[in-house]
């Protein structure tokens, strides 16, 4: 046992800390902390609605939940790219890249325009789409990161600075939205359905007793070695949010919670 503890503290823990210090992993962990107030805001309204079901004179605050918890995937897509640009040292792209991440997310949701009305499945922009938000946010961050490494017009002396900034934003924006268009509109692929299919085994496994124990036990083990449990939120938060969203929908339809 002493040998195992020595190996964990002297060999495994330093290597694990180095892995979790990776800016891409740290980006996801940081995003989960950023969106927590939004999650709690929606949760507070759901808790309030429990009392409202008995005290019917209370006002309906559901719009607050719909535009906080109900837009969680969009917020995640924004914050993933925002945090990545910050941690990778590309502050000049921080806002534009984050906004394009939202645009790419909406495009990849494959919305429909019916009689001039923009329609999108509400479930895709809420908690159920959080994994897609992470993937899209990382995709946009990678495109902007790779472009930033080219240092285009960095030593330019002829063009005004604002023109150089325009060009350096137009190119990665066009590439990002172009690739999203090819995926969603040309190839007709549904990223949401693809990720749900890939994520479902993990989601179902987490609902079992062994899965639940692992979700609770693994972060505790790493925390004992000085590694913050926040780094595991990239995996656990999507699982929890999808399960919570399913429970909310089930109760709203008059059924018992399933998770």
Residue ranges and their predicted role:
Residues 1-39, 45-228:
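Signature of multi-pass transmembrane helix bundles
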Residues 236-259:
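Membrane-interface interhelical connector segments
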């Amino acid at each position: 046992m002493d040998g195992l503890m020595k190996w964990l503290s002297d060999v495994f823990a330093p290597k694990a800390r180095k892995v979790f210090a990776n800016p891409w992993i740290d980006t996801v962990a940081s995003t989960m902390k950023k969106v927590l107030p939004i999650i709690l805001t929606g949760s507070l309204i759901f808790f309030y609605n429990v009392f409202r079901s008995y005290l019917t004179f209370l006002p309906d605050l559901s719009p607050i939940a719909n535009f906080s918890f109900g837009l969680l995937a969009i917020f995640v897509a924004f914050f993933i790219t925002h945090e990545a640009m910050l941690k990778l040292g590309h502050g000049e792209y921080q806002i534009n890249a984050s906004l394009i991440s939202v645009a790419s997310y909406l495009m990849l949701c494959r919305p429909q325009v019916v009689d001039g009305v923009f329609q999108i499945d509400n479930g895709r922009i809420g908690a159920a789409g959080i994994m897609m938000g992470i993937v899209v946010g990382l995709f946009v961050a990678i495109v902007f990161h790779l472009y930033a490494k080219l240092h285009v017009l960095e030593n330019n002396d002829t063009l005004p600075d604002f023109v150089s900034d325009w060009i350096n934003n137009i190119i990665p924006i066009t590439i990002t939205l172009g690739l999203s268009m090819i995926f969603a509109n040309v190839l007709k692929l549904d990223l949401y359905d693809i990720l749900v299919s890939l994520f479902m085994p993990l989601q179902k496994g987490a609902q079992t007793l062994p899965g639940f124990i692992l979700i609770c036990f693994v972060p505790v083990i790493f925390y004992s070695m000085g590694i913050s449990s926040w780094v595991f939120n990239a995996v656990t938060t999507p699982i929890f949010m999808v399960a919570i969203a399913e429970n909310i929908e089930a109760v709203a339809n008059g059924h018992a919670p399933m998770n």
